[in-house]
Each structure stands twice: as C-alpha cells, then as structure tokens.
C-alpha cells in the first residue's frame, strides 16, 4: 500500500545543507499498522510528511496504492491525497464549529450532498464514540475527545491510508491507551493502512504489526514487531525495548550498591529474556548446573506482536567462578545479562 523508494530529503539552513532523510526504503503492506520510532530530530516527521508530499523528497519515489505521487501533476496530487488522511499531535479543530461541523467540514468542501453528510458524520461519530457530543464545541472537550473528533474528520473522505504524526504525544497515559485501541479497531473494521510515528516503544508494542527504527535520517532496522522485540539487531532498538520495562528497585536497597565486588559481596544482576528464552527454565537450569542461587527482587513480563519478553532482577549467591560461568551459559542461551551492582 505504501512504498518509499530511496527517499532522500535535504534542507538548506543558513547556506548549509541539512540531510533529514538519507536513502530511506520502507514498505507498509495493505491493512497493516506500521510504527516508525526514533528520537527527536531523527527524521520521523519529515518521513511521514513525505508520504503525502507535504514535504516533497529531494530524491526518490513515494508509491501509495500503486501510484507514484512524485510523478503527479498538482491536480492529480490533490485527488490522490483524498485517499491519504492525516492526524497530528495537535488537533487543529475549528473552535467556532461543533463536533458535527468539524467532522462534516471535508465533506462540505467537496460539495457532498447534505443528506449524505448527515448520514456519514453520524456513522463516524458512532465509530469514535462521540454520538452524544456532536453538538458540543471543542472548548468543552477533553484532549482525548478532541483527538477522536480529529480521527473522525480524517476518515470522512474514506481514505485508504491514515498517517499519524505523534497523535498521542499530548495525551495522558490512560487517554493514550484509549486512542490506540480506537486506531486498532478502525484498522480492523475498515481495513485501513496506518503509518504512525512515535518516540515511545509502548505505542509500537500496543498496536503495531511492523516497526521501523530511524536514526539521523536513516532507517537502521525494520521488521515485524515480533521479530524486532525477539531479536533486536541495533543498539537503538534495544534501548527502545528496554524503555518499556519499568525497573525501579527501592532506593533503600540501591543505596547499598557498590560498583565493584568486595569480599563476600553478592552481584545484583538483571536478566533480559526475549523469544524462546522467556519460556525456557534457564535460571533454574543455571542454578542446578553451577550450584548458585537466585533471590528474585523484581520481574516483569509483557507481550509485543505475539512475542513474550521480560526481565528478572536477582541477587545471585555462589562461588565467583561459578557465577561467571553461569553468566556465560545464560548469554549463550539468548539471555542478556547486566550486573547492576554488588551488595553485602
């Protein structure tokens, strides 16, 4: 449905050329949700704005539904954009118009018959759960409700593609989850292809089928969510995945940590599990094999793309050589091992 081929984008600032996108290649299959994740300034917004040519690439081709947008005339591009909707971090609603009129706006601009507008808008408001708020003005809506209005308005033209530019960044965590759930529902009910950009791996984990990691204008890793979470190949992808873990040992405990081992001290080790290593009893096997004990302090498990992943933080007791051998054994069994400190 969406194919970006060798996309490059340069800006000129004070006489200097800034490379925003560098040879980007990305395919988003029809009916899937793809998330592009990266830090601020990585090129996410530029990339998504290239899809509907709000930013025209310096080089490369943008193919949407089999049509190369970069070859179209101005009039042809206007027509093609009707099948590509977009929502933003800020909702851009008309404050002087009701919820109903905000959603109806694109239909009125395209001279849609009034009876069709009424039917279509009511259907969309039901879809986003705002039927009872249709006569309310934006100033009386919560942030989540405003984004629901923006989504309904974006769907008014029956698009095939929905672009989401940090659509949940301005929302609280609970509202974010409700908007993500709505996008997932829309994807399933309408078969809509969704491309979203975010700096939060939690967003990708919740609703995406595929993910692309962008860094300094380059896509450095792409694949299904299950593939990336099970076997991240870049350090940045690993960092984003780790950010979904909520690791916070009590301060009273961490204050006892030392960075170097001392006589009779015990290491506090974080073990990260992905893919097959989650279900394998590797800690139990290591304990028996090397004669060491694990006192679990904290653990967490989660799912992404149907794949389990998680971590265990444990105080490890045993002979130093045995602990070292156990660490090597676990690493060889696809467990990431990190010594957080020493106690005792």
UniProtKB/Swiss-Prot annotation:
Keyword field: Amino-acid transport, ATP-binding, Cell inner membrane, Cell membrane, Membrane, Nucleotide-binding, Translocase, Transport
Keyword Cell inner membrane: yes
GO cellular component, one term: plasma membrane
EC number(s) per entry: 7.4.2.11
Domain ABC transporter: 2-241
PROSITE patterns linked to this entry: ABC_TRANSPORTER_1 (PS00211), ABC_TRANSPORTER_2 (PS50893), METN (PS51264)
Enzyme class: translocase
Quaternary structure (record): The complex is composed of two ATP-binding proteins (MetN), two transmembrane proteins (MetI) and a solute-binding protein (MetQ).
This protein's name: Methionine import ATP-binding protein MetN
Organism per entry: Haemophilus ducreyi (strain 35000HP / ATCC 700724)
Taxonomic placement: Bacteria, Pseudomonadati, Pseudomonadota, Gammaproteobacteria, Pasteurellales
């Amino acid at each position: 449905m969406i194919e970006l081929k060798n996309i490059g984008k340069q800006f000129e600032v004070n006489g200097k050329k800034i490379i925003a996108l560098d040879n980007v290649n990305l395919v988003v299959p029809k009916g899937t949700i793809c998330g592009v994740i990266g830090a601020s300034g990585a090129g996410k917004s530029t990339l998504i704005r290239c899809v509907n040519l709000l930013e025209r690439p310096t080089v490369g081709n943008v193919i949407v539904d089999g049509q190369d947008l970069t070859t179209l005339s101005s009039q042809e591009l206007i027509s093609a954009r009707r099948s590509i909707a977009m929502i933003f971090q800020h909702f851009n609603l008309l404050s002087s118009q009701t919820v109903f009129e905000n959603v109806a706006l694109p239909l009125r601009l395209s001279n849609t018959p009034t009876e069709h507008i009424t039917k279509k808008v009511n259907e969309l408001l039901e879809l986003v759960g705002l039927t009872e708020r249709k006569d309310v003005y934006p100033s009386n809506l919560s942030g989540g409700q405003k984004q629901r209005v923006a989504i309904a308005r974006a769907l008014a033209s029956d698009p095939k593609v929905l672009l989401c530019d940090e659509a949940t960044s301005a929302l609280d965590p609970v509202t974010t989850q409700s908007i993500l759930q709505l996008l997932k529902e829309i994807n399933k009910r309408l078969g809509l292809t969704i491309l979203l950009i975010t700096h939060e791996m939690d967003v990708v984990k919740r609703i995406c089928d595929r993910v692309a990691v962008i860094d300094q204008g380059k896509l450095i890793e792409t694949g299904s969510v299950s593939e990336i979470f099970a076997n991240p190949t870049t350090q940045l992808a690993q960092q984003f995945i780790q950010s979904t873990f909520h690791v916070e040992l009590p301060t009273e405990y961490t204050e006892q940590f030392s960075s170097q081992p001392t006589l009779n001290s015990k290491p506090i080790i974080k073990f990260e599990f992905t893919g097959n290593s989650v279900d394998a009893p590797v800690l139990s096997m290591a304990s028996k094999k090397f004669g060491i004990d694990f006192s679990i302090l904290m653990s967490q498990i989660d799912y992404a793309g149907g794949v389990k992943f998680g971590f265990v933080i444990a105080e490890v007791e045993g002979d130093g050589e045995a602990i070292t051998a156990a660490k090597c054994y676990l690493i060889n069994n696809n467990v990431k091992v990190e010594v957080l400190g020493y106690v005792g």
